[in-house]
Each structure stands twice: as structure tokens, then as C-alpha cells.
């Protein structure tokens, strides 16, 4: 691991903002739906009272192991293995509604920094990208058989890659000659199609994001957990979500808007579609990482934090 990797590996994003705006009850029940290496959870436990409770959820085996170690040393904490949309099971286990749900979306720094996990286009490793390497198929496996149009659709839908068809065509041409099994192999292929036209941004960024989202079903899980939050949060409970790209943030933004009585209206103030009853109230403004945090944690530069409180 490089010096830069060590610096960023265990820095939870927007920690103070999350604790100040999201945490409200020292004896409450909280869920960290994306435990990772436990940065947010450990900070929350430092504020949680003796009778408070925190459940961490993650599907990454290394994160689960870290969570189990924490659980062994703190009886207020319990670790659950699974996607964050297993929220109902967490509530059932605790026997009470949630006072706060935190989701820190996307890939974690330890996952990105470990070449063997296959998330990074800067490090050579197996083209995997699964959050749980024991479940489902890897990106390499999917690319070995997926139809050209399906590859293009994934790159466009989840990566907003304008030249998705060009990349998909090159992938299908290349795999006829040799399998695409390594991260740098795919990154170089994409760069050969796009060139390096965006200053400060690797040409494979959008495609790697798209493939990761697809192979892990990330946006489907986000849709599900947002709906689950309406039924599992206590009145006054708060939902805090940190997103790192526009697709995630758009889903969160529209969900909070639609459930807070702020859906857009047409002429005469009439709703454009079915108007949902208000169940959420936004808390504060949309937040981004401070200048001070950006200096010590460059990976927080694209982070967006939205918080909403359940009111009904």
C-alpha cells in the first residue's frame, strides 16, 4: 500500500457533518448500512449511550470481519452480513424502529486500493468488482458473453458514457482474440477508444463505475432501501445518505423530494403526477466536504450529503 493509500484508507467522509446533523439520541437505535471499515460506526459509538444500539451492515467479507472484531469488543454493536436492503431483518432483530440510518454509497477506499478486488483502473488486478467476491459473477465473466448492445446500455445508463457503443464494440472485437480478464487490460482498451481528452480524469472512470454498479445491483439496492426506510425509521428518525456520483444523488434527491410534499406542480399548482403524502422533511441544506477535509481526504471531493427526517 502506498503512502497515499495509507492516508486515505480509513478516513470516513464528512464525519462531523454526519454526526452533528444525523445523530440525535444517545440511547437510540442506529444502522450503518455501509459499514466498510467502521469509521462512521466507531465515531457514533463514542457518542452513543450505554443503552444505545448500533447495527452495521456490509456484504464485503473484509468489512464483515472488521465489524465482527468491533462487535466482540463492544456489546452495543452488532454486525450483519448482507446488502443494505436487508434493513427489515435488522429492525426485526432489534425489535424497535430505527432512529437513524446512514448510507455511505459506492466503493470504499480499502476496496479501491486493493488491486486484487478489481475496482481500480490504476492498478493491475483481476477484473472482478464484486462487493462480495463469493457471490454472483465477476465483470470479466459478464463481459465474456454479454451482447454488444447490453454492454453499451450498461455503460451509458450507469456511467453516462457518451461513446458507450464504441467501447462495447471494441470489447466484443477484443474478446474474440483474447479474454478480457485484467483491470489494466480493460482500462487500456477504453483509453484506446476515447483517448485522454478530459484533464484530471481517466477515460475509464465512467465505464468502471458503470460496470461496478451493474455487477453489484447497486442502484436497485438503493431504491429498495429508500422505500424500506419509510417503514423502518421511527417518527423523528433520520436518514443520512452520502453519494459520490450524479446517478445515486439523483435517486436520493427525488426520493426525498417526492416524500416531502415538494414534487413539481404544473399550471394552477396541480401535481404533475400522483402526489404522495408527506412522510419526510429535509434537514438542512445539501452538504459537501469542507475545504479543510478536501486537503486531507481528496476522495471526499465528489461527496454529497443529504439528510431527511421521518415526520409521518
UniProtKB/Swiss-Prot annotation:
SUPFAM superfamilies xrefs: Putative methyltransferase TM0872, insert domain, S-adenosyl-L-methionine-dependent methyltransferases
Gene3D superfamilies according to UniProt: Putative methyltransferase TM0872, insert domain, Vaccinia Virus protein VP39
A GO molecular-function annotation: rRNA (cytosine-N4-)-methyltransferase activity
Domain of life from the UniProt record: Bacteria
Catalytic activity as recorded in UniProt: cytidine(1402) in 16S rRNA + S-adenosyl-L-methionine = N(4)-methylcytidine(1402) in 16S rRNA + S-adenosyl-L-homocysteine + H(+)
Cross-referenced Pfam families: Methyltransf_5
Single biological process term from Gene Ontology: rRNA base methylation
Statement: the UniProt record of this protein carries the keyword Membrane: no
Listed EC numbers: 2.1.1.199
Compartment annotation: Cytoplasm
Family of this protein: Belongs to the methyltransferase superfamily. RsmH family.
Stated role: Specifically methylates the N4 position of cytidine in position 1402 (C1402) of 16S rRNA.
PANTHER family xref list: 12S RRNA N4-METHYLCYTIDINE METHYLTRANSFERASE, S-ADENOSYL-METHYLTRANSFERASE MRAW
Protein name: Ribosomal RNA small subunit methyltransferase H
Organism lineage: Bacteria, Pseudomonadati, Pseudomonadota, Gammaproteobacteria, Oceanospirillales
Gene (name only): rsmH
Amino acid at each position: 500500500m502506498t503512502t497515499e493509500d495509507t492516508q486515505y484508507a480509513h478516513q470516513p467522509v464528512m464525519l462531523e457533518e454526519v454526526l452533528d446533523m444525523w445523530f440525535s439520541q444517545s440511547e437510540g437505535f442506529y444502522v450503518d448500512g455501509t459499514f466498510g471499515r467502521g469509521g462512521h460506526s466507531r465515531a457514533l459509538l463514542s457518542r452513543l449511550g450505554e443503552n444505545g444500539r448500533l447495527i452495521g451492515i456490509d456484504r464485503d467479507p473484509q468489512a464483515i470481519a472488521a465489524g465482527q472484531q468491533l462487535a466482540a469488543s463492544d456489546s452495543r454493536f452488532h454486525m450483519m452480513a448482507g446488502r443494505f436492503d436487508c434493513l427489515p431483518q435488522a429492525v426485526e432483530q432489534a425489535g424497535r424502529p430505527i432512529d437513524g440510518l446512514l448510507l455511505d454509497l459506492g466503493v470504499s477506499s480499502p476496496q479501491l486500493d486493493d488491486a486484487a478486488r478489481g475496482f481500480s483502473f490504476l492498478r493491475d488486478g483481476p477484473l472482478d468488482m464484486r462487493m462480495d467476491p463469493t457471490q454472483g459473477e465477476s465483470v470479466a465473466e459478464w463481459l465474456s458473453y454479454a451482447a454488444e448492445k447490453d454492454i453499451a446500455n450498461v455503460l451509458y445508463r450507469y456511467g453516462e458514457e457518451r461513446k458507450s457503443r464504441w467501447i462495447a464494440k471494441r470489447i466484443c472485437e477484443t474478446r474474440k482474440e483474447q479474454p478480457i480478464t485484467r483491470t489494466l487490460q480493460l482500462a487500456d482498451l477504453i483509453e484506446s477508444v476515447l483517448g485522454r481528452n478530459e484533464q484530471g480524469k481517466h477515460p475509464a472512470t465512467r465505464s468502471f463505475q458503470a460496470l461496478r454498479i451493474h455487477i453489484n445491483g447497486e442502484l436497485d439496492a438503493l431504491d429498495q432501501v429508500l422505500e424500506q426506510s419509510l417503514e423502518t425509521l421511527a417518527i423523528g428518525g433520520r436518514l443520512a445518505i452520502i453519494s459520490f456520483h450524479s446517478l445515486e444523488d439523483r435517486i436520493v434527491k427525488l426520493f426525498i423530494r417526492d416524500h416531502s410534499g415538494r414534487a413539481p406542480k404544473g399550471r394552477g399548482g396541480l401535481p404533475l403526477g400522483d402526489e404522495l403524502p408527506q412522510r419526510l422533511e429535509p434537514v438542512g441544506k445539501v452538504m459537501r466536504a469542507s475545504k479543510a477535509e478536501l486537503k486531507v481526504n481528496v476522495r471526499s471531493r465528489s461527496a454529497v450529503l443529504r439528510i431527511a427526517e421521518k415526520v409521518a
